[in-house]
A protein has these predicted regions:
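NTP-dependent small-molecule kinase module
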Residues: 170-218
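Conserved lysine of the Walker
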Residues: 42
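A glycine- and Lys/Arg-enriched "phosphate-lid" helix/loop adjacent to the NTP-binding pocket
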Residues: 122-170
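N-terminal pre-Walker A segment at the start of P-loop NTPase domains
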Residues: 8-16
Length: 218
């Protein structure tokens, strides 16, 4: 469904999910993915979205783990942090807990794991924070580094940007029980581009951006 010439302004990310979750009296365990390119604001959005709207208090963040392992050079322990994060995800899934994690979606390996979780009764909810270009992603990461945050090599950012969008289109949107695609070009004015899910009719609020992201013909 296209809602022409309208882009819904999000004062905060809680409003993105209210229509999806407010009517669910009894909810199954859920895995929530906060996705988007490097520098898109995933970690910044996590607190209000997860603790506020979704009531999910288990957020596995490999970047935070890396900082805990090596505060001044987290990039040096990225592999080890990733291994610890994956182990924690498996632990939470085995405990049938609801949990969340962030990713650029540049890896395809989450898809079969998510399918397996869904087969056991889990629901998969996806929130993708979109940026219009890899160049903006690079600029956001550079800004983060100037503020004391962790760096990501430029070539890695570009690879993840394209790979994440490709996998979003072909793997993760078709798999999600619910998905929200959010324009985070302006951090003070996030806008909902489109939403939908397995049993939720897709609604497109910004047709031009939707066609651009999904590579649809005009």
């Amino acid at each position: 469904m296209l809602i022409d010439n309208e882009r819904i302004l999000l004062d905060n990310l809680e409003s993105v999910v209210s229509t999806v979750f407010s009517c669910m009296a009894e909810q199954p365990p859920k895995v929530v993915i906060l996705a988007g390119p490097n520098g898109a604001g995933k970690s910044t959005a996590a607190n209000k979205l997860l603790l506020g709207a979704l009531k999910v208090d288990e957020f596995v963040n490999a970047d935070t783990i890396a900082t805990g392992l090596s505060a001044f050079a987290p990039e040096r322990v990225a592999f080890e942090a990733g291994r610890i994060a994956l182990a924690r995800l498996e632990e939470l899934a085995n405990a049938r807990a609801s949990f969340a994690f962030e990713t650029t979606l540049s890896a395809r390996s989450y898809a079969p794991w998510l399918k397996a979780l869904q087969a056991t009764g889990y629901e998969f909810h996806l929130f993708f924070l979109w940026l219009p270009s890899a160049d903006m992603s690079i600029a956001r990461v550079a800004e983060r580094v100037r503020s004391g945050g962790h760096n990501v090599p430029e070539e890695t950012i570009r690879r993840r940007y394209e790979g994440g969008l490709a996998n979003l289109r072909t793997l993760y949107i078709p798999l999600a029980n619910s998905w929200q695609l959010i324009d985070n070009t302006r951090r003070d004015k996030r806008r909902l581009i489109a939403s939908g899910g397995l049993d939720i009719p897709a609604e497109v609020y910004s047709p031009n951006l939707w066609r651009r992201i999904m590579r649809l013909e005009k």
